[in-house]
Amino acid sequence: MNLLIIITINITLSFILISIAFWLPQMNLYSEKANPYECGFDPTSSARLPFSMKFFLVAITFLLFDLEIALLLPLPWAIQTTNTTTMMATAFILVTILALGLSYEWTQKGLEWTE
């Protein structure tokens, strides 16, 4: 019963905060706030730099493999448990899924900088 109350309160608070964050910024729209500021002068060029999608894909792939390492680091301690078969199967499934994802990314040429 306590868990149900806590979940209800969390969902309600989350909904209220998301609603406030969605509606509050739209109350005051000033065009000056959207412009970049360069010591009172008009900007000479665009303040927004282009973003490389290739870099983004490589960065996301790095984060996935970094997370894999973080998940596999406790394996030496998990080997000491009584149920090593389940632990090894879970680790094998995790590594297999990530290897399949990497091979798919490689075949789709998502890891190459030049086209």
From Swiss-Prot:
Predominant localisation class: mitochondrion
Compartment list: Mitochondrion inner membrane
Catalysed reactions, as listed in the record: a ubiquinone + NADH + 5 H(+)(in) = a ubiquinol + NAD(+) + 4 H(+)(out)
InterPro entries xrefs: NADH_UbQ/plastoQ_OxRdtase_su3 (IPR000440), NDAH_ubi_oxred_su3_sf (IPR038430)
Membrane topology: Multi-pass membrane protein
Keywords recorded for this protein, A-Z: Electron transport, Membrane, Mitochondrion, Mitochondrion inner membrane, NAD, Respiratory chain, Translocase, Transmembrane, Transmembrane helix, Transport, Ubiquinone
Protein's UniProt keywords contain Metal-binding: no
UniProt superkingdom: Eukaryota
Keyword Transferase tagged: no
E.C. code: 7.1.1.2
Pfam families hit by this protein: Oxidored_q4
Entry GO MF terms: NADH dehydrogenase (ubiquinone) activity
Functional summary from the UniProt entry: Core subunit of the mitochondrial membrane respiratory chain NADH dehydrogenase (Complex I) which catalyzes electron transfer from NADH through the respiratory chain, using ubiquinone as an electron acceptor. Essential for the catalytic activity of complex I.
Binding partners and assembly: Core subunit of respiratory chain NADH dehydrogenase (Complex I) which is composed of 45 different subunits. Interacts with TMEM186. Interacts with TMEM242.
Annotated protein name in UniProt: NADH-ubiquinone oxidoreductase chain 3
Native source species: Rattus norvegicus
Gene (name only): Mt-nd3
